[in-house]
A protein has these predicted regions:
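Conserved alpha/beta catalytic core and glycan-binding cleft of carbohydrate-active enzymes
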Residues: 15, 28-177
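Substrate-binding/active-site clefts of carbohydrate-active enzymes
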Residues: 1-14, 24-27
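Hydrophobic residues within beta-strands of alpha/beta enzymes
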Residues: 17-19
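Generic beta-strand/beta-sheet core signal
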Residues: 21-24, 45
Length: 177
């Protein structure tokens, strides 16, 4: 109830037309069925079409966004073994009643530049002793860890970033930058 009141406040006061709501114990069904939010885009880390019950929506306002697409694209991009099938499935995923949001970089992991610049995370300077963030970044430094001035490395990194964005744009679902 508190979450829906907060979302309604932001919608009415500031004209916000969509929300990304991630975390445990989110009342997905309650928010998805809320009459005042049916024209508002709601993005969750998990939702299934059961939230609609018997009534299938005219406007698909509920979407999911998780890192599955990101992991598949990054693994395929760096040529991990046996990734073509997983990449193709992730690219074609488009559930009938719930929108799928795809991304190759987000707020809780490597940026796209970091994905092509580092094999390992380097968070030593932030006071967390490099314990924060995921160890599974599916990244490849293109031949040199961190910033580089070598033209060949920079060129390969640019190509890899363009490849990642092309895979994002050509996949089914909604691309998120």
């Amino acid at each position: 109830a508190l979450i829906s009141r907060v979302l309604l406040f932001w919608k009415q006061q500031y004209g916000v037309d969509g929300f990304a709501i991630f975390g445990p114990a989110i009342p997905v069904s309650e928010l998805g069925k809320h009459p005042a939010l049916t024209s508002t885009r709601l993005i969750f880390s998990y939702a299934d079409e059961q939230i609609y019950g018997e009534d299938k929506p005219v406007f698909r306002h509920v979407a999911t966004a998780d890192n599955h697409f990101q992991c598949c694209v990054r693994s395929y991009m760096k040529s991990d073994e046996n990734q073509l099938h997983a990449f193709m499935q992730a690219s074609r995923s488009n559930p009938p009643y719930i929108e799928q949001v795809n991304y190759v970089a987000s707020h809780d992991g490597f940026t796209l530049q970091d994905t092509v610049s580092y094999d390992f995370r380097h968070n030593e300077a932030n006071g967390e002793d490099n314990r924060d963030g995921s160890w599974q970044n599916y990244s490849w430094n293109c031949g040199e860890e961190g910033p580089s001035r070598k033209k060949q490395i920079l060129s390969l990194r640019t190509i890899q970033k363009k490849n990642a964005l092309m895979m994002l744009y050509l996949a089914q679902g909604i691309p998120m930058l």
